[in-house]
Amino acid sequence: MGVDLTGVQKKKRVVRHHTYSTNPYIKLLIKLYKFLGKRTNSPFNKLIHKRLLKSRNNRAPISLSRIAVCMRRRTVWLKKGKKSPIAVIVGDVLDDVRMTRIPALRICALRFSKSARERITGAGGECLTFDQLAMMAPTGKNTMLLRGRKSGRESVKHFGAAGVPGSHAKPHVSSRGKERQRSSKRRHAFRHK
């Protein structure tokens, strides 16, 4: 007779309750948004608190062009006289040189690259910090929560079995020279002899 292993199939969901970051600013923000989440009972503050606890790899950066596209979709339906919503990113905001003109955006993020900050303020926008956001919108009213792609890292492209049919994983190649092509699809004329 077999044994019914019911506990094996259950996957333990890992939830972070504290940060591993040594950054004092992030630690203060975690305290602030934990307090706001309890006091205001708003899901926005609870979500910000949850994202602040994440590791750096899970706080992916986002480009200015992506923010501009997302905000354009939201501001189409705005009535005249209403202020545009604040884009909230728990991560870094990076510049995108492919976008020549940037609209006036109000963005709150953990960090802005130097060129991104210059372009936002030059277009008539605002670069806000999370403590300023807590004063302006303590319940998250008139805000739009955005995040970058976590799968944008180079290491993610190698996840999976390379060479398996249907897999798009990149193989780890030790050398990329013409004479030493060691990847799965090397040319036979230049194979290692």
UniProtKB/Swiss-Prot annotation:
This is Large ribosomal subunit protein eL18. It comes from Trypanosoma brucei brucei (strain 927/4 GUTat10.1). One of its GO terms (cellular component) is ribosome. It is found in: Cytoplasm. GO terms for biological process: translation. Its main location: cytoplasm. Keywords: Cytoplasm, Ribonucleoprotein, Ribosomal protein. PANTHER family: 60S RIBOSOMAL PROTEIN L18, LARGE RIBOSOMAL SUBUNIT PROTEIN EL18. Residues 158-193 are annotated as: Disordered. Residues 183-193 have a biased composition (Basic residues). Pfam families: Ribosomal_L18. Belongs to the eukaryotic ribosomal protein eL18 family. GO terms for molecular function: RNA binding; structural constituent of ribosome.
